[in-house]
């Protein structure tokens, strides 16, 4: 085998190894650090907004599930975290509008409008909670996103648990597998740069 072949083989092994690392980390990711069933806040992790300023199905599912949890009495308020992504619309504002349309009073909504990734979702939400003296949160997001979110929140000084937002429409096997694969790659990226969580940096 020539040097090019060895390089290709080594690169393939490295990529597969990193993917396996991410997959194992997702399987072992924590889902909570507390037995609490009632919390000071529900943190809704942002998802992209469409080009017309409306929630995407993923974002709508997260907000809808958070509204259900609010109505069940899990927490008295929602922290909606997400800044501007690929267009001019702020995720937190769109989520707040969606929550109000579903009957949540504006007084129960706390938008966090700066975060551009999941690390910042956690860090900036924690800063809001610390300012208000809130100490516990349920973290709502899509099921495929929650393992990475759990790894991130496990490094924050906060009592928390994750809660999955089921999709509003059934997902195809291809869509589900694609989402898991993308999250595995993002988990690897996070594991490489995990210490940045401690400094609230992207």
Spans of features found by a protein language model:
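A transmembrane-helix-recognition feature enriched in membrane-embedded lipid enzymes
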Residues: 173-199
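Short, intrinsically disordered low-complexity segments
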Residues: 3-5, 61, 188, 194
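N-terminal membrane-anchoring alpha-helices
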Residues: 1-40, 202
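A structural signal for short, hydrophobic/glycine-enriched beta-strand patches
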Residues: 23-180
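Structural signature of transmembrane alpha-helix termini at the membrane-water interface
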Residues: 20-27, 67, 188, 192-195
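Enrichment for repetitive, rod-forming helical segments
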Residues: 11-13, 69, 155, 193-196
């Amino acid at each position: 085998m020539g040097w090019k072949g060895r390089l290709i083989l080594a690169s393939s092994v490295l990529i597969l190894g990193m993917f396996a690392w991410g997959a194992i980390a997702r399987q072992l990711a924590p889902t909570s650090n507390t037995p609490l069933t009632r919390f000071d806040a529900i943190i809704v992790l942002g998802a992209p907004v469409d080009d017309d300023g409306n929630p995407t199905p993923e974002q709508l599912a997260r907000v809808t599930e958070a509204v259900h949890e609010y109505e069940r009495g899990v927490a008295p308020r929602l922290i909606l975290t997400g800044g501007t992504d690929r267009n001019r619309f702020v995720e937190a504002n769109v989520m707040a509008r969606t929550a109000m349309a579903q009957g949540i009073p504006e007084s129960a909504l706390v938008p966090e409008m700066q975060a551009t990734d999941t690390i910042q979702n956690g860090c900036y939400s924690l800063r809001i909670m610390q300012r208000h003296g809130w100490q516990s949160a349920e973290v709502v997001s899509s099921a495929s996103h929650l393992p990475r979110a759990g790894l991130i929140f496990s490094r924050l000084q906060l009592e928390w648990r994750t809660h999955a937002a089921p999709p509003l429409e059934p997902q195809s096997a291809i869509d589900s597998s694609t989402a898991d694969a993308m999250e595995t790659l993002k988990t690897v990226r996070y594991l490489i740069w995990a210490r940045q969580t401690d400094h609230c940096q992207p």
